[in-house]
Regions:
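Domain-edge interaction signal
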Residues: 1-101
Length: 101
């Protein structure tokens, strides 16, 4: 699950707004594109998942993602260099050592 979300953030480079990230994960999970099982609640501002928020907090503490404020105050979620290395290592592990021979 962590790698699914990390990979999503890496794919987009950065995602403007945590609300947008929650909405994107909700849509992709609903369509079966993301293999996650977050529970979402619909609010007036969009979909929100406490589970996803906790995962994002963990990813931040592990320094795999960062959330910064843009000039207009919007939160921007980005993958860090460390996050990219973890993602690459995990993808290489999934492929197996013989796949590169």
């Amino acid at each position: 699950v962590e790698l699914e979300v990390l990979g999503l953030i890496a794919k987009y480079g950065s995602i403007r707004g945590l609300v947008n990230l929650h909405g994107l994960v909700y849509e992709l999970q609903s369509r079966g594109v993301l293999k996650t099982d977050f529970t979402f609640i619909r609010y007036s501002f969009g979909y929100y998942s406490k589970d996803l928020e906790e995962l994002l907090s963990t990813l931040r503490k592990l320094e795999l993602i960062r959330v910064r404020r843009s000039g207009d105050g919007t939160e921007v979620v980005e993958i860090t260099e460390k996050g990219l290395r973890v993602l690459e290592a995990a993808r290489g592990f999934k492929e197996g050592p013989m796949s590169r021979v």
